[in-house]
Design a protein with these regions (language model features):
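Eukaryotic scaffold repeat domains enriched in small/polar residues
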Residues: 1-155
Length: 155
């Protein structure tokens, strides 16, 4: 996977009657029914920005430490402008959670869109780790192979 490159993202609606798909490069999310017909398209109004020096340094450090043979190839494939978001999840209220590619030293930033696609909130989680699930009571977060946390969502 090339950092900040285009990704095919998808998740299922909470009622399991439709699913959401996105090609992160075009900043649109389509909701499809079980027949693969488009129910609607949501425009995500986020700008693509250049990869910063700090982000380049993070990429170089990560690949030098863990994948030194791939560093040169990855650096050659980096896009000039990064995609706006790199992960997508749909919660129990059919709100769309997008993990933004904005650089933060210690956090990862998630934008929550309403069911209609309007920005509602931003959530900051620890930079190292991954959001595993969203329920009406908590956010599941996996820091590494040994540490799993539940964060309480505060409205």
């Amino acid at each position: 996977r090339v950092p900040f490159g285009s990704e095919f993202l998808y998740d299922i609606s909470s009622d399991k009657d439709s699913f959401y798909v996105s090609w992160s490069e075009n900043s649109q999310i389509a909701e499809l029914d079980s027949e693969l017909d488009t129910i609607r398209t949501i425009d995500v109004r986020l700008e693509r920005t250049p990869v910063s020096e700090d982000e380049l340094a993070d990429i170089e450090e990560e690949f030098s430490d863990h994948h030194p043979n791939q560093l040169r190839s990855v650096m050659d494939l980096l896009p000039d402008r990064k995609v706006s978001y790199e992960e997508m999840m749909v919660d129990h209220q059919n709100r769309i959670w997008l993990k933004l590619t904005r650089w933060h030293e210690n956090d990862q930033e998630w934008l929550i869109l309403s069911e209609e696609g309007e920005p509602e909130k931003r959530v900051l989680l620890p930079k190292e780790g991954m959001l595993t699930h969203i329920s009406e009571h908590h956010l599941g977060f996996r820091k590494d192979d040994h540490i799993f946390a539940l964060f309480e969502a505060v409205e």
